[in-house]
């Protein structure tokens, strides 16, 4: 049987449900697919299928994530849901499934809880740009003023972490009532679900496609071609490249080399242009083979700089996940795998009051590399020691 072709007729947007355990994230995900299945825009995925999320690996870390897809009249959505709190943290830090917007689920019976706050903080740090709130289980609260109070608390919480708390759409409803409702899409139990989908369509803008961002390609390999010059190969991370374009070679020192790409090739054929996602070779004008190496990046002039020091949120693998068996302190020196660069770095700063970091923790720390690498906020990386992954991180702030 031939694979079904993915037809791009509607803009594609990645979303996910976040929030405290048992506040109804998976039930809401099920309710969305049920409602849209009645309109012929999705396949219904029941709660028990969402809850037993399959395992996947990202940067050497195992994460349980459920992916569902559905459409509205306007868009195609890929929606992620994680069963466990640790899975959310690992997903956000590794960027296994990136989100253009998040649906924060808060139970009206509880209001914001510790994990609510933690998920919002992480969403801010990894730059999830838009947030929509679904106040769930409203059928279990008799006094509407209590729901108003929960809404105020959630708006305050979002504002605290840099989201526009006053503007964020807040929808009230019961995901369970929608899941249990009859199969008539006009039934009133589905109204909040439709409101939520309208908010997603209208409040989360179409994401900027990777191909429209400034060009960047991590260098994987370098070859010398007699009579032609030096070729660097890699997978284009973002943007586009055409013969004649000026680029910079960045990383491994503070010196930035400028050059021109004279030819772009894929499978030994010359291309008019390489775009995000393509594996290409770029022929560089006037660059010797020993002037460029794996771990550097080729980038649009002025778009990224080399740095040694940065702050990052790091998830430290548990022993059971193949991580360290013992805690570490300031001064710990593992390897950092940043794009194609593999560089030693030192933990030079931990949060106030944190003396040691235990396997299973996630902590913001300051890192100093032994040489500069092309780094920017939101950059994901792996932490390795003795040939095994011991952690995963995301850059939250570049220092120098």
Swiss-Prot record:
Q: Which residues form the signal peptide?
A: none
Chain intervals for the UniProt region annotation (G1) = 19-26
Ordered alphabetically, the record's keywords are: Cytoplasm, Elongation factor, GTP-binding, Hydrolase, Magnesium, Metal-binding, Nucleotide-binding, Protein biosynthesis
Q: Which CDD domains match?
A: EF_Tu, EFTU_II, EFTU_III
- Any one GO BP annotation for this protein: translational elongation
Q: Where is the tr-type G domain?
A: 10-208
Region of interest (G5), ranges: 174-176
Binding residues for GTP: 19-26, 81-85, 136-139
Instruction: Specify where the region named G2 lies, as residue ranges.
Output: 60-64
What does the entry list under GO cellular component? cytoplasm
Domain of life where this protein originates: Bacteria
HAMAP family cross-referenced by the UniProt entry? EF_Tu_B (MF_00118_B)
Task: Name the job this protein performs.
Answer: GTP hydrolase that promotes the GTP-dependent binding of aminoacyl-tRNA to the A-site of ribosomes during protein biosynthesis.
Q: What is this protein called?
A: Elongation factor Tu
At the top of the EC hierarchy, this enzyme's class is hydrolase
Question: Under which EC number(s) is this enzyme classified?
Answer: 3.6.5.3
- Family that this chain belongs to: Belongs to the TRAFAC class translation factor GTPase superfamily. Classic translation factor GTPase family. EF-Tu/EF-1A subfamily.
Q: Which residues bind Mg(2+)?
A: 26
Catalytic reaction(s) noted:
GTP + H2O = GDP + phosphate + H(+)
Say if the entry is tagged with keyword Hydrolase: yes
Region listing for G3, in residue ranges: 81-84
Gene name for this UniProt entry:
tuf
Give the classification, highest ranks: Bacteria, Thermotogati, Thermotogota, Thermotogae, Thermotogales
Region: G4; residue ranges are 136-139
- InterPro entries listed in its UniProt record: EF-Tu_GTP-bd, EF-Tu_GTPase, EFTu-like_2, EFTU_2, G_TR_CS, P-loop_NTPase, Small_GTP-bd, T_Tr_GTP-bd_dom
Specify the species: Thermotoga maritima (strain ATCC 43589 / DSM 3109 / JCM 10099 / NBRC 100826 / MSB8)
Q: Name one GO molecular function term.
A: translation elongation factor activity
Tell me where it resides.
Cytoplasm
């Amino acid at each position: 049987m031939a694979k079904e072709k993915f037809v791009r007729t509607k803009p594609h947007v990645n979303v996910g449900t976040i929030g405290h355990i048992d506040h109804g994230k998976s039930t809401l995900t099920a309710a969305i697919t049920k409602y849209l299945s009645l309109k012929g825009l999705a396949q219904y995925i029941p709660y028990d299928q969402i809850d037993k999320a399959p395992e996947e690996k990202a940067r050497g870390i195992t994460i349980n994530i459920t992916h569902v897809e559905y459409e509205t009249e306007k868009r195609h959505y890929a929606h992620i849901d994680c069963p466990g709190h640790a899975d959310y943290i690992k997903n956000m830090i590794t960027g296994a499934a990136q989100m253009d917007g998040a649906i924060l689920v808060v139970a009206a019976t509880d209001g914001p809880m510790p994990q609510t706050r933690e998920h919002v903080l992480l969403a801010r740090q990894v730059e999830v740009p838009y947030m929509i709130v679904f106040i769930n289980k409203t059928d279990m609260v008799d006094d509407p003023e209590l729901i108003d109070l929960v809404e105020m608390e959630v708006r305050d919480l979002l504002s605290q972490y840099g989201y526009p708390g006053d503007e964020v759409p807040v929808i009230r409803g019961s995901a369970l009532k929608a899941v249990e409702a009859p199969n008539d899409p006009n039934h009133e139990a589905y109204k909040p679900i439709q409101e939520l989908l309208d908010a997603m369509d209208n409040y989360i803008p179409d994401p900027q496609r990777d191909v429209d961002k400034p060009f960047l390609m991590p260098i994987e390999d370098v070859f010398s071609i007699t009579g032609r010059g030096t070729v660097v190969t890699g997978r284009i991370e973002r943007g586009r490249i055409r013969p004649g374009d000026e680029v910079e070679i960045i990383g491994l020192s503070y010196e930035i080399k400028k050059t021109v790409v004279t030819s772009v090739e894929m499978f030994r054929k010359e291309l008019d242009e390489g775009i995000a996602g393509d594996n290409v070779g770029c022929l560089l004008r006037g660059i010797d083979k020993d002037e460029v190496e794996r771990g550097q990046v080729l980038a649009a002039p002025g778009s990224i700089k080399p740095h040694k020091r940065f702050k990052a949120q790091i998830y430290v693998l548990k022993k059971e996940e193949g991580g360290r068996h013992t805690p570490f302190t300031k001064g710990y020196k593992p390897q950092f795998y940043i794009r194609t660069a593999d560089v030693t770095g030192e933990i030079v700063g931990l949060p106030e009051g944190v003396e040691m970091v235990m396997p299973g923790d996630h902590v913001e720390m300051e890192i100093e590399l032994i040489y500069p690498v092309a780094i920017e906020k939101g950059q994901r990386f792996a932490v390795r020691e003795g040939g095994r992954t011991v952690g995963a991180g995301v850059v939250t702030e570049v220092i120098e």
